[in-house]
């Protein structure tokens, strides 16, 4: 996979050069191409913004240097722009993007874009209902979520299958040694060696965590009869705990 990023601050993307993603680049599993669109400005001092037509506070990033930077790319693929008005990024989008050969992200900073910049993009995407100083951090988050799904990036392919959101549920609790830490014990079922019981416990706990923290995910889910039974049991267990109080 080849990922292009148009940005005024390419140095911000250093974190993508380390850990699993950095190793993935070294192994040739993906490539990051950082393009400073300031280099495509033909104005004095390489300026890339100007005052808005019609007046108003602040400055607006110009379309020409960004368009010229895009045109310089050999393989653009899907063009994505980070914007508060975009649809919210999620795991399904990461999975879809991970199947692309080329992706291009456009990052703003401080100012908004000339409206014609948005017309250059195939998708407008946000990471949440809040405002940041630029699009670099959202872009890094989306790149991380996408690239980690590529074959060979994670050591264990099952890791991407069993973790939160991959099947529409939050992840079940996990434990490692010691089995007893200051009186806090690992659930006995995980020590039993009975993989059928362990799978059932994990499914139950994933449903329980999702019901508690992200009930909206359950509303979108086509529940199996077994999940309906488990959720009924979860409600009964919760009621029993309340009755003890």
From Swiss-Prot:
Give one GO molecular function term: tRNA (guanine(37)-N1)-methyltransferase activity
GO BP terms: namely:
tRNA N1-guanine methylation
Catalysed reactions listed for this entry: guanosine(37) in tRNA + S-adenosyl-L-methionine = N(1)-methylguanosine(37) in tRNA + S-adenosyl-L-homocysteine + H(+)
Q: In the UniProt record, does the keyword Heme occur?
A: no
Binding annotation for S-adenosyl-L-methionine: 108, 127-132
Which terms are listed as keywords in the entry?
Cytoplasm, Methyltransferase, S-adenosyl-L-methionine, Transferase, tRNA processing
**What Enzyme Commission number does this protein have?**
2.1.1.228
Broad class of enzyme this protein falls into: transferase
| InterPro entries reported in the protein's UniProt record | Alpha/beta_knot_MTases (IPR029028), tRNA_m1G_MeTrfase_C_sf (IPR023148), tRNA_m1G_MeTrfase_TrmD (IPR002649), tRNA_m1G_MTases_N (IPR029026), tRNA_MeTrfase_TRMD/TRM10 (IPR016009)
Under CDD domains, the record lists: TrmD-like (cd18080)
Task: Name the SUPFAM superfamilies on file.
Answer: alpha/beta knot
One family from Pfam that matches here is tRNA_m1G_MT
Q: Which cysteines are joined by disulfide bonds?
A: none
What cellular component terms from Gene Ontology apply here?
A: cytosol
Q: Where in the cell is it found?
A: Cytoplasm
Tree of life domain: Bacteria
Q: Does the keyword Transferase apply?
A: yes
Q: Could you give the subunit structure recorded for this chain?
A: Homodimer.
What's this chain's function? Specifically methylates guanosine-37 in various tRNAs.
Kindly give the HAMAP family that the UniProt entry links to this protein. Answer: TrmD (MF_00605)
Identify its protein family. Answer: Belongs to the RNA methyltransferase TrmD family.
Under what name is this protein listed?
Answer: tRNA (guanine-N(1)-)-methyltransferase
The species this protein was found in: Lactobacillus delbrueckii subsp. bulgaricus (strain ATCC 11842 / DSM 20081 / BCRC 10696 / JCM 1002 / NBRC 13953 / NCIMB 11778 / NCTC 12712 / WDCM 00102 / Lb 14)
């Amino acid at each position: 996979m080849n990922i292009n990023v148009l940005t005024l601050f390419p140095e911000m993307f250093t974190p993508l050069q380390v850990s699993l993603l950095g190793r993935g680049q070294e192994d040739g599993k993906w490539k990051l191409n950082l393009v400073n669109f300031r280099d495509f400005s033909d104005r004095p001092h390489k300026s890339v913004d100007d005052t808005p037509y019609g007046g108003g506070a602040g400055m607006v990033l110009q379309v020409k240097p960004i368009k010229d930077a895009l045109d310089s790319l050999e393989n653009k693929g899907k063009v994505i722009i980070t914007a508060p008005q975009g649809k919210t990024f999620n795991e399904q989008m990461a999975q879809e993007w991970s199947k692309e050969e080329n992706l291009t992200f456009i990052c703003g900073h401080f100012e908004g874009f000339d409206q014609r910049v948005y017309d250059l993009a195939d998708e407008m995407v946000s990471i949440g209902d809040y405002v940041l100083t630029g699009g670099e951090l959202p872009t890094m988050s989306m790149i991380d979520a996408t690239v980690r799904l590529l074959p060979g990036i994670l050591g264990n392919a099952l890791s991407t299958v069993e973790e939160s959101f991959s099947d529409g549920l939050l992840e079940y609790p996990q434990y490692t040694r010691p089995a007893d830490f200051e009186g806090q014990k690992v659930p006995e079922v995980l020590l039993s060696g009975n993989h059928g019981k362990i799978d059932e416990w994990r499914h139950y706990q994933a449903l329980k965590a999702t019901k508690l923290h992200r009930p909206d995910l359950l509303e979108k889910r086509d529940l199996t009869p077994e999940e309906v039974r488990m959720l009924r049991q979860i409600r009964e267990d919760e009621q029993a705990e309340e009755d003890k109080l």
